[in-house]
Amino acid sequence: MEGLRRHSVMLDCKLWKDDPIYFFKTLPPYISKYAQRADDASIQAQIDVFGKDDVGAMPGALGPRGNFAAVTFAESFPDRVAMLAYLNEVLSFYECFEKQMTEMLDATLYANPVPKDPKYDNPVWQANYKNTMTKWPKILENLDPKLGPKCVKSLVALVEGTDMEPKMAHYKTMKEYALDRTNYIAWPVACDNAEFGSQLNLTQDQLDSVRDIFLPLWTHSCYVYDYYHYDKEAEIHSTYGKGRSMINSIPLLNRLKGLSVEEAKAWLKQRCFELEKEYLQRKEDYFSENPVEAVPVDLRRWFLSQEDLATGFAIWCATTYHNHPPFGEGYAAPYEKRRKEGALWFEKVTESDQLMTGGFEVRYAN
């Protein structure tokens, strides 16, 4: 697998090695060489939806150890990692604008709406969000006529997916829950984003041939997500979700195993380390039967993409402003720093299309 990385470097060891918040012991996280573009794109998405004076109104993909796209799609091409950063920043607002997202995707929402803070019932923000939802599918298709539409299709499938909430009282095992949760946290969308970002040429048969190898990583990501999103989800649920079952491993572990919140978190963390071992064993078994030189290059790169998805997601979930203090205020420092460096963003959602086609290399003041 040596020599396959072109667009990423290992994240500084000080940011993850031996850190108890990072739930891997062997696999390191990587970050895009173009991480600044990803951050700039995320800020543009914030401006497009909330306006230049409310950047961070809903914290999305930024974090102190890496932008979501920069660490999960680390091997993406420079223009594509920026586009994915914009896309995922916008999609991270789904809990605020679920109705608008569904409408603009021409999808049908079968699940109950996600509980949200009423402050997001802002008609200007809602109109801006609808504008963002008209532009990025076109940009994806222009960048890649094959993989761009695939990303959009998987997002529609996610929106139209079965609601997990009624099932929470009936799951008998964590494995059963994790299979559904993988889809619910948009992992098929993330996989298609990764394939798009790295511009991989893979057949469906090739993807299917290695799918089971990555199942431990997918479950790992479900558990990391539940571990680090629980506190925020519990707060939102207690305020706006009364009468609904909370979709998270922690209340399920309480029902299935009688674990307290802290005991359930300890269980999830330990299980993540076990899942890493399971994945590494499956990977070793695969390459013992399939010599590396006999495996197509893009299929080998798919292994890197899957590992980046899981490791990047793990470090991001543990640190992102989406879940952790200072929350939306975390956008202020990088936004102000870039402004002092002379970076300029488009101030209206109807103008920022020009920025997208340039790979999110922001303009600078003279």
Swiss-Prot record:
Pathway: Secondary metabolite biosynthesis; terpenoid biosynthesis
SUPFAM superfamilies: Terpenoid synthases
Chemical reaction(s) catalysed: N,N-dimethyl-cadaverine + 2,6,9-trimethyl-13-oxatetracyclo[6.3.1.1(6,9).0(1,5)]tridecane carbocation = pre-flavunoidine + H(+)
The UniProt record lists the keyword Acyltransferase: no
EC numbers on record: 4.2.3.-
Chain coiled-coil ranges: none
Entry-linked Pfam families: Terpene_syn_C_2
Keywords: Lyase
GO BP term (any one): terpenoid biosynthetic process
Top-level EC class: lyase
An annotated Gene Ontology molecular function: lyase activity
Translocase found in the keyword field: no
Biological function: Terpene cyclase-like protein; part of the gene cluster that mediates the biosynthesis of flavunoidine, an alkaloidal terpenoid with a tetracyclic cage-like core connected to dimethylcadaverine via a C-N bond and acylated with 5,5-dimethyl-L-pipecolate. The tetracyclic core is synthesized by the terpene cyclase flvE and the cytochrome P450 monooxygenase flvD.
Subunit and interaction comment: Homodimer.
Family assignment from sequence similarity: Belongs to the terpene synthase family.
Name of protein: Terpene cyclase-like protein flvF
Species the sequence originates in: Aspergillus flavus (strain ATCC 200026 / FGSC A1120 / IAM 13836 / NRRL 3357 / JCM 12722 / SRRC 167)
